[in-house]
From Swiss-Prot:
Pfam families: AKAP7_NLS. The keyword Nucleus applies. One of its GO terms (biological process) is ribosome disassembly. This is Uncharacterized protein C15D4.13c. It is found in: Cytoplasm; Nucleus. Keywords: Cytoplasm, Nucleus. GO terms for cellular component: cytoplasm; cytosol; nucleus. The lineage of its organism: Eukaryota, Fungi, Dikarya, Ascomycota, Taphrinomycotina.
Length: 204
C-alpha cells in the first residue's frame, strides 16, 4: 500500500441481495458511456466514513480500534438481525446535472453513532456533514469519455427512472469492515480488499 492513503469503514452488502437489480439496471439504462463505469455487485456496501492513513502504524491503529470496540458495537446492535431495504436513488455533486456519484438509498438509517465514535478518536477525515449512508451505483471517477475520466455526469434520467425502484429487500448486515479504497478485479466483477472486520451478530 502506498502512503498517504485512504481506507473506509463500511457495512458490506452480500452480492446475492443486489445482483439481480443491478443486472436490470444495466439492461434498462440507455447510456453506454455512463455504464462503462459500472463495477458489478461485489463492490456493494454502505459507506460510513473515510480513514486517512500515513503509514503502517496508522493502519494497525484503526484495525486495533475496530477489534477493541467489537463488544461495544455488537451490544449496541442487540441480538436481532440487522436488516435494511435499498429503495430509490440520490446523488452527490453540485447538482443533479453535475453529479459525481449516483447511489441507492437505504430506508433505515441508524449508524450515525458509528461515525461519531471513530471521529472522536481522530480516525475519520474531518467532515461536519451528517452521515449519508449510501450504496454507490455509479461514480464519475470510473467513467471515461474518449479515453479520459469525466468530472461529472447528468444523474437526472437515472433518478427519474429509478427514483422509487426497490433495489433490495431485507438485506442482512452481518459485519462491519475496514477496506482499502480502489476496487480491484475485472470490470463488472470488481471488489474491495478487506483489511479487518467484526461480526455484528454472533450465531449460537
Amino acid at each position: 500500500m502506498r502512503y498517504p492513503n485512504l481506507l473506509f469503514l463500511a457495512l458490506p452488502i452480500s452480492e446475492h441481495y443486489i445482483e439481480e437489480s443491478l443486472k436490470y439496471f444495466k439492461l434498462t439504462s440507455n447510456d453506454p458511456m455512463i455504464l462503462s463505469g459500472f463495477r458489478g455487485p461485489r463492490v456493494s456496501h454502505l459507506t460510513i466514513g473515510m480513514i486517512p492513513v500515513k503509514n503502517d502504524e496508522d493502519v494497525l491503529k484503526c484495525m486495533d480500534f475496530l477489534y477493541n470496540k467489537e463488544d461495544e458495537i455488537r451490544k449496541s446492535y442487540g441480538e436481532k438481525k440487522i436488516t435494511i431495504d435499498l429503495k430509490g436513488t440520490s446523488f452527490f455533486g453540485k447538482s443533479p446535472q453535475e453529479a459525481k456519484v449516483l447511489y441507492a438509498t437505504p430506508v433505515d438509517k441508524h449508524n450515525e453513532w458509528l461515525k461519531v465514535i471513530f471521529t472522536e478518536h481522530n480516525l475519520f477525515t474531518k467532515d461536519a456533514r451528517p452521515l449519508t449512508l449510501h450504496c454507490t451505483l455509479l461514480n464519475s471517477r470510473y467513467i471515461k469519455y474518449q479515453g479520459r475520466r469525466i468530472r461529472f455526469f447528468n444523474s437526472e434520467p437515472f433518478m427519474e427512472k429509478y427514483g422509487q425502484f426497490l433495489w433490495a429487500h431485507n438485506i442482512e448486515l452481518d459485519k462491519l469492515s475496514i477496506m482499502k479504497t480502489g476496487a480491484v478485479g475485472e470490470p463488472g466483477n470488481m471488489y474491495y480488499e478487506e483489511l479487518a472486520s467484526i461480526p455484528l451478530l454472533v450465531n449460537d
